[in-house]
Swiss-Prot record:
Bridged cysteine pairs (disulfide): 52-64, 56-73, 63-77
GO MF annotation list: ion channel inhibitor activity; toxin activity
The protein, known as: Conotoxin ArMSGL-0123
Primary localization: secreted
Signal peptide: 1-20
Compartments reported by the entry: Secreted
Length: 79
């Protein structure tokens, strides 16, 4: 094989390695952003659930969730 052929193959290999490394970095950044979003969403849900529990506790009932932003309280939650 000529030197030119070896240089071309080496260059192609380097391009392949660099692009695959960039793709891995983008995937990792996307995964990190998804985890951060999931954590924020669970934190806000937890805060809303605590508010619902406190509100229904005053009425001596169980919090069954929220509907239109308002806590739903009942003796027993169905479904």
């Amino acid at each position: 094989m000529s030197r030119l052929g070896i240089m071309v193959l080496t260059l192609l290999l380097l391009v392949f390695i660099v692009t695959s490394h960039q793709d891995a970095g983008e995937k990792q950044a996307t995964k990190r952003a998804a985890v951060n979003f999931r954590w924020r969403r669970s934190f806000t849900r937890r805060a809303a659930a605590e508010e619902c529990e406190e509100y229904c506790e005053e009425e001596e009932k169980t919090c069954c969730g929220e509907e239109d932003g308002e806590p739903v309280c009942a003796e027993f939650c169905l479904g």
